[in-house]
Amino acid sequence: NQEGLFGGR
């Protein structure tokens, strides 16, 4: 989910 938002991965 947050992969593209602030680079969670």
Curated annotation (Swiss-Prot):
Q: Does the keyword Membrane apply?
A: no
Q: Which GO terms describe its biological process?
A: adaptive immune response; blood coagulation; innate immune response
Q: Cite the post-translational modification comment.
A: Conversion of fibrinogen to fibrin is triggered by thrombin, which cleaves fibrinopeptides A and B from alpha and beta chains, and thus exposes the N-terminal polymerization sites responsible for the formation of the soft clot.
Keyword set includes Metal-binding: no
Signal peptide residues on this chain, from the entry's feature table: none
Assigned keywords, A-Z: Adaptive immunity, Blood coagulation, Coiled coil, Disulfide bond, Hemostasis, Immunity, Innate immunity, Secreted
A Gene Ontology cellular-component term:
extracellular region
Location, primary (coarse class): secreted
Protein location: Secreted
User: What is the annotated quaternary arrangement, including any partners?
Assistant: Heterohexamer; disulfide linked. Contains 2 sets of 3 non-identical chains (alpha, beta and gamma). The 2 heterotrimers are in head to head conformation with the N-termini in a small central domain.
The role this protein plays is: Cleaved by the protease thrombin to yield monomers which, together with fibrinogen alpha (FGA) and fibrinogen gamma (FGG), polymerize to form an insoluble fibrin matrix. Fibrin has a major function in hemostasis as one of the primary components of blood clots. In addition, functions during the early stages of wound repair to stabilize the lesion and guide cell migration during re-epithelialization. Was originally thought to be essential for platelet aggregation, based on in vitro studies using anticoagulated blood.
Question: Domain comment, in the record's words?
Answer: A long coiled coil structure formed by 3 polypeptide chains connects the central nodule to the C-terminal domains (distal nodules). The long C-terminal ends of the alpha chains fold back, contributing a fourth strand to the coiled coil structure.
Q: What is this protein called?
A: Fibrinogen beta chain
Organism classification:
Eukaryota, Metazoa, Chordata, Craniata, Vertebrata
Q: Which gene encodes it?
A: FGB
